[in-house]
């Protein structure tokens, strides 16, 4: 069950998103020559910026029931997954790669303008809807509240802003409060709304029955049980369930480890990830149990 969003959380998530949009667009406009520097995988800096701009086209489009901006780039996707973009999470990587290749724009200032324009319209849309109103998400069969769409955009903007800044050799601070918000209002609703096996690494989690008590520092409400059951995952509010491993995590470190931008061992060495309990050694395997697009 996905929790409802308080008025205060709804305002905080929009404020955080506005702040990150301002930061990332200013960053893009400040980079004069992105060159061919690799930023994420095989994507260079400009391609990551393009991907982020397409996220700003597609995610708000899904929330308003208009997928035309993405279908214009990939006409063969129209109607393939109903009101969503893909049928299965395994298809998402290929489709996002094709989208980036389909749009030749690589001028960073133009991409910044696109992000700003999409953000401006999205915030207008937010004034007309409830944060708890459900909409079809990227993957067919998953519906999420508008608040989760907002924090999905926050996740994309924070993480790819970090990618772009690193590729450009810039220092980039991730606000811990923003990391808590996107985990609380995007990660958790997504896990709760998805098939229990969708976000699990089936090979790594096969046969594993373990409950992790995850505590994100600075997030008083982010104290949840991640329950793995032979390849399935549920997220529950803290209860009397017997815990195998307690995890205390710095929110920024948890975010970067989750998205494989930082080694978990580096975070452990810095005290950003700590474990205790009946089976503390399971902490070293926690990230390997999770699958991400």
Specify the residue positions occupied by each region the protein language model found:
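Short, helix-capping/interhelical loops that line the mouth of catalytic, cofactor-
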Residues: 2-11, 57-128, 132-134
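Acidic/His-leaning functional-site neighborhoods
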Residues: 220-250
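Contiguous mid-protein beta-loop-alpha structural module that forms a pocket-lining wall or clamp
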Residues: 100-174
